C-alpha cells in the first residue's frame, strides 16, 4: 500500500483498501454498537482479547453519530482496552475477562471497563513493561481526552478486578 501511495496511484490504492476492508468485515462482522467507529476499534481489540483466551461481555448503547472525535474514540477505547488485555494476560486463562459498559444519555457518555488482574497493586498506574520509555503514555492520552470533554475518570483496584470509569460531557447525538 505504501508503494501505491508513493507512486500516486490513488484509484488502485482505494480498490486495494476496499478489498482489505471487505476481508476484515468477513472475518468479524460483530456489531457492538450503532457507531461504526467504536465498532471498528472494538472488533480489533476484542479480537485480540479473544485470541488471548479472554472472555468478553459488552453492554453498549451509543448512537451511530455523536459529537466525539474519531481520534478521541481510538485513544479512549484503544488505550483502555490495551491495558485491560495486558492485565488479563498475567492471570490464569480461566479467570480472564473484560466487561465493557458504555451508554450515552442527556449529553453524558459513560464508559466503564472492568477486567481481571493479579492481586498485585499498581497504585501509580505506571507501566509494568520493561521498556517504560516506549510504554506508559496511554493513560496520559486517555486523561487528555477526558479533560477535553470536561469529564472525569476514576481507576479502582478491587483486588483481582480493575475498573476504569470515564464520564464525558457535552457528547450530543449528531443528526
State each model region's role:
Residues 18-22, 34-51:
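Short beta-to-alpha transition helix within the HATPase_c
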Residues 30, 56-77:
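Conserved short strand/loop->alpha-helix "switch" segment adjacent to the catalytic nucleotide/phosphoryl-transfer site
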Residues 49, 85-93:
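A short, flexible helix-to-loop-to-beta junction within the catalytic ATP-binding CA
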Residues 93-107:
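Short beta-strand/loop element within the Bergerat-fold HATPase_c
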Residues 107-140, 175:
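Glycine-rich/acidic phosphate-handling loop/turn and adjacent ATP-lid/helix
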Residues 119, 158-165, 171:
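Glycine-rich nucleotide-binding loop
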Residues 150-160:
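Glycine-rich ATP-binding loops of the HATPase_c
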Amino acid at each position: 500500500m505504501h508503494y501505491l501511495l508513493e507512486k500516486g496511484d490513488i484509484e488502485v490504492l482505494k480498490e486495494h483498501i476496499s478489498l482489505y476492508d471487505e476481508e476484515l468485515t468477513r472475518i468479524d462482522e460483530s456489531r457492538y454498537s450503532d457507531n461504526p467507529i467504536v465498532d471498528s476499534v472494538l472488533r480489533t481489540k476484542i479480537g485480540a482479547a479473544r485470541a488471548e483466551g479472554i472472555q468478553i461481555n459488552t453492554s453498549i448503547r451509543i448512537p451511530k453519530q455523536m459529537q466525539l472525535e474519531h481520534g478521541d474514540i481510538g485513544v479512549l477505547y484503544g488505550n483502555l482496552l490495551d491495558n485491560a488485555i495486558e492485565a488479563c494476560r498475567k492471570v490464569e486463562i480461566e479467570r480472564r475477562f473484560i466487561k465493557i459498559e458504555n451508554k450515552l444519555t442527556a449529553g453524558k457518555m459513560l464508559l466503564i471497563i472492568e477486567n481481571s488482574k493479579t492481586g498485585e497493586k499498581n497504585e501509580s498506574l505506571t507501566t509494568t513493561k520493561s521498556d517504560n520509555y516506549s510504554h506508559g503514555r496511554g493513560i496520559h492520552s486517555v486523561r487528555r481526552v477526558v479533560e477535553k470533554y470536561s469529564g472525569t475518570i476514576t481507576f479502582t483496584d478491587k483486588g483481582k478486578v480493575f475498573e476504569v470509569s470515564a464520564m464525558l460531557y457535552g457528547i450530543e447525538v449528531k443528526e
